Design a protein with these regions (language model features):
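Catalytic cores of DNA base-excision repair glycosylases
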Residues: 2-3, 10, 14-184
């Protein structure tokens, strides 16, 4: 097993040289982060940037999203594909405004109870909005860990094994930025 400290240094060094600039990385607003996370599911970042900006211009708050028509949400979602994501975003917004008095939950289970929000998305929202050190993986993070720690193996590596490494390497003081570094 390769050294954890060396891995962390490698990731931070790369990030400091190649950090990508996205609008959702400049906010701690959980609604904005949630919108970005849903848009980024199976969609390239370059395609998401203009859609994200336009969506938030039309629906700047969870209340504005909840009160919008399905038609307006789907028109703004056009070009991202998987319309169900946009519809779930609206339905979850309606629940947040109605049942949760407009407050986006800060607990994983409460977020996962909303339409369209799973384990990764719930933890990403909390981590990126509140810098809470939660353990999660997505495709890019998985690839980084496989390439670094399992580069010479041809064995199937289970997510639980990768999650243990994610937990060991997590920068608990700056988890938000650490995950951005892993994704870059």
């Amino acid at each position: 097993m390769r050294d954890i400290k060396k891995f962390q240094k490698t990731v931070w060094d790369y990030y400091n040289q190649h950090k990508r600039d996205f609008p959702w990385r400049k906010t701690k607003n959980p609604y904005h982060i949630w919108v970005s996370e849903v848009m980024l599911q199976q969609t390239q970042t370059d395609r998401v940037v203009p859609k994200y900006k336009a969506f938030l211009k039309q629906f700047p708050t969870v209340r504005s999203l909840a009160s919008a028509s399905q038609k307006d949400v789907l028109e703004r979602w056009q070009g991202l594909g998987y319309n169900r994501r946009g519809l779930n975003l609206k339905r979850a917004g309606e629940e947040i405004v109605g049942r949760l008095k407009g407050k986006i939950p800060t607990e994983v289970d409460a977020l996962m109870a909303l339409p369209g929000i799973g384990d990764y998305t719930s933890k990403a929202i909390i981590t990126f909005a509140h810098n809470t050190p939660l353990v999660f993986i997505e495709t890019n993070i998985r690839t980084v860990f496989l390439d670094y720690f399992f580069q010479n193996t041809h064995v199937l590596v289970h997510d639980r094994e990768i999650l243990r490494l994610v937990e060991k390497t997590l920068d608990i003081k700056n988890s938000r930025e650490w995950y951005y570094a892993l994704m870059d």
